[in-house]
Amino acid sequence: VGLTAFRLFPVPSHAQSNSSWWFKNDQAMWELIGENILEEYIDDISNLIEVFASGPFPLYKGRTERISMSELHSYDPLEGLNSPAHTAPALYELKKIVQVIYEKDYRFAQPPKMPTLTATPADGKVILTWDNISDTRTRDPFLGNINDFEGYKLFRATDKYFADAEVITDGYGTPMFMKPIFQCDLKDGKFGFTDFGLVNGVGYNLGSDTGISHVFVDNNVMNGRTYYYGLVAYDYGAPHIGPGISPSENNLVVELDEAEEVRSIGKNVAIVTPFKPAAGYKQPDITIDESNLPGGGKIVPTILARSSIKKDHRYQVSFGIDTIASLPQYDYGFVYTTKSIAVTDLNDNLVVYQENPTKFVSTNLVKNDSLDYWSLNTKAPFSTDVFDGIQLNVDMPFDQGFYDYANSGWVQGSGMMRVVPTIRESSYLAWDYHIIFSSNASVYTTTTSIKTGIRDAVDNRIPTNEILLGQSFGFYVKNETLLKSDGSHVLMDMVVHDVNKNGVFDKSEDKIIVGGMRNDGKWAGTAFVIDFNLASTATYPKSDDIFRVKFSRPFWKDDYLKFTINSYDGIDADSLAKTMDNIRVVPNPYVATNVMETAVSNQFLNQRRSLMFTNVPAQALIKIFTISGVLVDEISINNSPEKGIVHWDMLTREGLEIAAGMYLFHIEALATGDQKIGKFAVIK
């Protein structure tokens, strides 16, 4: 049947009449919708009634007729709308999309599950975190219940309607899209602008294959100003359905009342005001309880979201490894990579965070395609997502072990001795060792009985006639990293390289090959080479001297870091007294308005004036006086312990607007009695 009648008209007078177009007047309304007329409305904007109609048509007893209707809105140039051809390209594009939806039996492509956004205010910044429900739980029935999640976009506005974020125009030059301050997407080869499902000639930006993150720190904010953040998850659309369906994203909902005050917000929206910390506030901090990271990498935990931390909770960071290559028949010789990181809350005995090859942030893990293994990113330091308000900053600048010349040396005593790593096999034996000297000249004797397969520092095979077995040494080499199944340390084997080929062990000329012995008695591999060529009787190491041989290496499965979150309930009285001197009124002078004041779109609403006191105690009393000493207003501050600002609406105690002029303020900290007196000016 199609659309047979359309009328748009003002609400008629409520005077009693049987002929007015009002819903209780059956005959008038029947005649209205039964008339074959499509009439546009160009009169004044007012309270309008919109009537669509199709018909008349017969509706027989027992028969069901289904009616489908679509109401489309577009911005189109008046020149085209008023032309004989009545061109409306934006409207026609919408019609194409609606037609596809109709033909698909109203099964819409759905956006991903809505994330929950959390905003934590700080001094000059806002920390934004969100959960992972969108990227892990999304299923789109329109596309066969697949997870079509693609990424996140984060928007910031100072307007409750997000109007100042809507700066991207469509193909017709009409502002239509919001510009994100942060975007991240899956590393899946889907990036850039779509060439399907164009909205008024504009494709959807799928991102840059950055990898997914669940945290963003916005440093481009001003203390005391209220910001509105919105986070949307988006999918990658449906390019193969009809003309293509554009990617879908979550809605941002900010519900306002008649006074334009926020009534409710969606869970993906956060309203936050950054602030200076309160006078006397003791910031939470972290204590490193125990660090066992001998390999050389660094992990620094930092508190990012104060509101989410758990007081006095202890955490342990641990690692998972993947073996890349190994020495045959030797349990302590292999090349490995660190492929995962996990954090356990020791108080709750619960894993609260982890990254591994199946779930990681951005480029925190990378894959070596040629050898088919995953590793923590060694090219640059990286940060984890936020867990319990904490973020880990990780720096592991190497993916294989190597000799650490800078941190190797004498732990106890001294002497002339040279330690040289091998160019290949050391990477299989990159542990920490102690060379321990003894008063017993035969404290260790060579164990291996087979001369073949022994290599020197430059990876050359040493001829068997240059190998001396059964030699005794006045020192031994202990592996400080690995333990045997009985809990004892692994001892390294040693053989002599008879450099001068005289068949006798000459300490001043020959070299000592240090390595491991296989289960079958053969040499497993060389860790390093020792020589005393430069030592004299006076400079030869003495009994109880210890030399540390250190290798830098990726995080090992037995490495760990333990730390505790410290949160303080009280205030620092000395700090409070000093900070009271820094109390300021912003802006001072107040001239007509300032950026902290929220805009109102209703012309009949008054301006929401605002003046801020900063660096104030969390519990305090402010009294404001005229210059002649008349009390204007009192402000009782009862902030959260960390919040150090308070806004004044610039109204008197009687609810009247204050006059222009000079004012005095008196602030008293309720906890300590410290006081501050100052002044500010108001110019209207």
Language-model segment annotations:
Residues P58-L72:
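Short Pro-Gly-centered flexible turn/kink motifs
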Residues M662-K684:
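C-terminal tail/sorting-segment detector
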